[in-house]
Amino acid sequence: MKIYRVGGSVRDELLGLPVKDQDYVVVGATPEDMIRQGYRPVGKDFPVFLHPETHEQYALARTERKIARGYKGFAIYATPEVTLQEDLARRDLTINAIARDEAGNIIDPFGGIADLQAGILRHIGPAFVEDPVRVLRVARFAARFGFQVAPETFELMKEIVHTGETEALVAERVWQEIAHGLMEQHPSRMFHVLRECRALARILPEVDALFGVPQPAHAHPEIDTGIHVMMVIDYAASQQYPLEVRFAGLTHDLGKGTTPPDEWPRHIGHEARGVELVMDLCERIRVPRESRDLALLVARFHGDVHRALELRPSTIADMLQATDAYRKKVRFQAFLQACASDFHGRPGFADQPYPQAEHLSKALQAANSVDAGAIAMQLGQSHAGDTDLPMRIKRQVYAARVGRIKSLLSNP
């Protein structure tokens, strides 16, 4: 039995990056051998075991054979006769098919080190086309490392899309890869790669539709809506904003993709149109509730936030209520981060001030100083038995909040 460290940990080590999870391949062993040595079986689709002390994953060397569409359509063959090279050959890219033995020696049968040095993402063999998830993974690695995709690998990615294999992707896996890509240092790179191999139109057609849609040049020097959205998510990444903010940045302008061309470059009503598109996208790829809810709010209200300095106190109070800012203060700050990213995601605007965010934060603080409980108690005593009492309390609290915001704006 021989044990090799493989995959991402070896790759990242060679790149001088922090190593997180470590995966191992075991050659020349059976499941019974592993169990006898104290390893705990956890693999459902193929033999994977947890080390009895470190709890790191150890998988038996295996080969795979395509038997059906999709990334789960494989027959697994794992026996002691499977060699390390055969196991490495089933992997997606050369840079992910490097191993290190227990003595520290590197095994690199497919030229992965040379591709790391050259900054190239290259597939290992023709079996690359059998797993549509690899299209997303290659795009994600492009965003992570800034590497170029080898031309021949790009052609295979296009083939995967053309044959309809991406249609078999499981929604949750699509979201998982998109989420990972959004959290990279330059997430726009992922979407440019997906668009270049024509996968973006299949996976996120609402985002793909934004490219080529013009905006007013005086407000958007980049003009192209798709380019703008890419700048927004890159800005959010540069600020290390969380996933929810980055996803909201990706989807905030989806409504512009449905503007009739004869109305370009204006996009009146795109916020309201975008809400339905965001909801449909989130349902289709199973976006988690936290990311979905923030994206919906940003799509609907980002224009109002940009105009915050011009809004009446009552309009600001309405927005705070509609965004549930009184109860969800942390989410409201994420909401403002996404809107700020929209503002900064334009050529020449990255370092410009965005006072709207602080303006609305102070407005929320002022409105929150209203003691709704005290108002309810006072009205409950003076209007006992009034069937309209709940609505009366609501109106009184609202008026008090508007008053506090008005006072703030009068004395900045």
Swiss-Prot record:
Sequence ranges assigned to domain HD in this UniProt record: 225-326
PROSITE patterns: HD
Reaction it catalyzes: a tRNA precursor + 2 CTP + ATP = a tRNA with a 3' CCA end + 3 diphosphate; a tRNA with a 3' CCA end + 2 CTP + ATP = a tRNA with a 3' CCACCA end + 3 diphosphate
Gene3D superfamilies the UniProt entry points to: Beta Polymerase, domain 2, cca-adding enzyme, domain 2
SUPFAM superfamilies: Nucleotidyltransferase, Poly A polymerase C-terminal region-like
Keywords: ATP-binding, Hydrolase, Magnesium, Metal-binding, Multifunctional enzyme, Nickel, Nucleotide-binding, Nucleotidyltransferase, RNA repair, RNA-binding, Transferase, tRNA processing
Keyword Nucleotide-binding: yes
Hydrolase as UniProt keyword: yes
GO BP: any one term: RNA repair
CDD domains the UniProt entry points to: HDc, NT_ClassII-CCAase
InterPro entries in the cross-refs: CCA_bact, HD/PDEase_dom, HD_domain, NT_sf, PolA_pol_head_dom, PolyA_RNA-bd, tRNA_CCA-adding_enzyme
Chain sites annotated for binding ATP: 8, 11, 91, 137, 140
Amino-acid positions noted as binding Mg(2+) in the UniProt annotation, renumbered to this chain: 21, 23
GO molecular function: ATP binding; CCA tRNA nucleotidyltransferase activity; cyclic-nucleotide phosphodiesterase activity; magnesium ion binding; phosphatase activity; tRNA binding
Enzyme Commission identifier(s): 2.7.7.72, 3.1.3.-, 3.1.4.-
Cofactor (UniProt): Mg(2+); Ni(2+)
Residues that coordinate or bind CTP: 8, 11, 91, 137, 140
Entry function: Catalyzes the addition and repair of the essential 3'-terminal CCA sequence in tRNAs without using a nucleic acid template. Adds these three nucleotides in the order of C, C, and A to the tRNA nucleotide-73, using CTP and ATP as substrates and producing inorganic pyrophosphate. tRNA 3'-terminal CCA addition is required both for tRNA processing and repair. Also involved in tRNA surveillance by mediating tandem CCA addition to generate a CCACCA at the 3' terminus of unstable tRNAs. While stable tRNAs receive only 3'-terminal CCA, unstable tRNAs are marked with CCACCA and rapidly degraded.
Family per record: Belongs to the tRNA nucleotidyltransferase/poly(A) polymerase family. Bacterial CCA-adding enzyme type 1 subfamily.
HAMAP family named in the record: CCA_bact_type1 (MF_01261), CCA_bact_type2 (MF_01262)
Name assigned to this protein: Multifunctional CCA protein
Source species of the chain: Nitrosomonas eutropha (strain DSM 101675 / C91 / Nm57)
